[in-house]
Structures are given as C-alpha cells and as structure tokens.
C-alpha cells in the first residue's frame, strides 16, 4: 500500500493453510519413493515427540485425527521469538495428553502439518523448503513459489499483509509463528497456482489412486467420516466431490474451492486480515454460467 504497487497474477501472497495441500503432496511423493509409508508412526521420523504422542501415525497427522494439541496454544500472545517447525515437538511437550485417542476423533490442528514438515525433511534428507522447490515447484514451472525462510530465501513479487486498525490499514505481515513452514509458510501467485491446479488434474506428481485417497474423507475408528482428506476439506455437492480450504494468518486471508468433475477451481488470495473469501468463492461457484 505504501508504494501503491498494483497486484498482478504474478504477485506472491502468503498461502497460510492453503500450504497444507503442498505439504501433504510432499508426503505422498515420499511414500511413492518408498521413503515412508502413510501409516508409519510419526515418531519413526520425529523421535523427540513427547511420550503421549508416540503412537500417532503420519496418516493421522495428515487428516487431523491425531488428537494432538495445537502448538500455537503454547505460544505466548506477546512473544516476539520466532517459532520454527523444529520447535513444535517441544511446545506440545508442555502438555501430557491427547485431546482424544488418536484416530477416534477429528480436531483441526496446525501441529500435524508442522510435524509433517519434519517428516519430509528427515525422510528425504533435505530441508523442507528445498524439497518443495526440487520436487514440486521447479518441475511444475512454479517460478514465483517459495516456502519462505527469512535470511535464506526471498519472495519475488511479494504482497505484504495488512490489518485494519482504528480505521487505517497498517502492515501486519509477520507473527511469532510465521517461520513455521509446514502448516502455512508458502508464498505463491495466481499464475503459479494455475500450474499447480493443472498438475492435480493431470496427476503429474502423484498417481491417480493416491490423489483419490487424498481427496477422500478420512474415516474414524467408529466408521464416521471427518470431512477432511490429505490437506483438503472434502464434501459432496450436486456436481460431485467438492474440495476446499481456507487460509488465514497475520495479514492474509485466502480460499480455494475445487470441483474436479466440473473442472472448476476458484482461488482467492488477499493480503488483508479478515474478510470472507470462502463465501465469495462459494458464490462464484454457484453462478449459472459456471454450472
């Protein structure tokens, strides 16, 4: 806002929780490589997990059925210390119990995807950001995309985040958890998300069978569905399976809605706190000309 720079399709926004679909794909790539199995214990790769979390599986992290508490609840609101993915096991170690027995319930938690970034690093032998670049962004031509690390990487055409304070928009671009990558640390552009969406439809990165599993609601131990797959909320619409996700972090609010049977994908990226891009995406999808 300070420079009145215009947003373009190449402008990079922080994805917040839209990042989770990329983290999930990284895990699936490693499963296809034979470096891990989706039903492995997470502790195989993250041995520093607290004792109460040592029976949690990678699948349960992917589907928010682990019962693990959200690490953000252990971060003091006025903290200026930057939390990283590697700090998450210690943060959840401040507690001593799961919210529910793993696999028996659903509870959306950023903890799972921060831990999955550690799983990716240790299974691949590469930093999480480098793995994303080499296995996802570069092969798909996503030249504006990066899992941003301050002092390590840069964001090519970066939109900074803003919040409305006392009637004025002020820059509120980073919080104490902004350095956590697995749950929300990717910056990308609309141009790059077109490449991503085409790759999903064409099964360029993972097999059709694995993609189908990612787009299927997880099932709890009592047979109930959760409405969440691997990095996507999943529900039914008149046109078939509907995939969606909302992302919100300091200064950014985003939404994605995808209906594969209609070959329809709607993405809204905003560099502001608040607003309701998910509602707008749903209203766009309902337009008569797009049905």
What is the role of each PLM region?
Residues 14, 60-62, 107, 114, ...:
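Structural recognition of the beta-strand scaffold that forms the well-ordered cores
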């Amino acid at each position: 806002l300070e420079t009145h720079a215009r947003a373009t399709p190449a402008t990079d926004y922080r994805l917040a929780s839209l990042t989770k679909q990329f983290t999930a794909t990284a895990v699936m790539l490693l499963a296809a490589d034979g470096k891990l199995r989706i039903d492995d214990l997470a502790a195989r790769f993250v041995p520093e997990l607290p004792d109460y979390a040592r029976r949690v599986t990678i699948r349960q992290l992917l589907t928010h059925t682990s019962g693990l508490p959200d690490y953000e609840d252990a971060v003091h609101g006025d903290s200026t210390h930057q939390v990283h993915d590697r700090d998450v096991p210690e943060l959840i170690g401040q507690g001593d119990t799961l919210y529910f027995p793993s696999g028996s319930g659903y509870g959306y938690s950023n903890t799972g995807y921060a831990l999955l970034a550690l799983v990716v690093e240790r299974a691949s032998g590469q930093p999480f950001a480098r793995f994303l670049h080499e296995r996802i962004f570069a092969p798909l031509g996503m030249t504006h995309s990066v899992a941003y690390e301050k002092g390590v990487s840069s964001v090519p055409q970066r939109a900074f985040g803003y919040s409305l304070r006392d009637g004025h928009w002020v820059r509120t671009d980073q919080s104490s958890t902004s350095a956590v990558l697995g749950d929300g640390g990717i910056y990308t552009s609309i141009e790059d998300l077109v490449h991503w969406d085409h790759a999903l439809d064409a099964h360029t990165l993972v097999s059709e069978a694995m993609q189908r599993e990612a787009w299927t609601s997880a099932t709890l131990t009592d047979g109930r569905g959760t409405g969440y797959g691997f990095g996507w909320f999943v529900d039914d619409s008149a046109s078939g399976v509907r995939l969606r996700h909302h992302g919100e972090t300091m200064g950014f609010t985003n939404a994605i809605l995808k209906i594969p049977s209609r070959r329809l994908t709607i993405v809204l990226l905003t560099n502001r706190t608040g607003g309701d891009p998910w509602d707008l995406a749903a209203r766009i999808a309902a337009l008569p000309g797009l049905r």
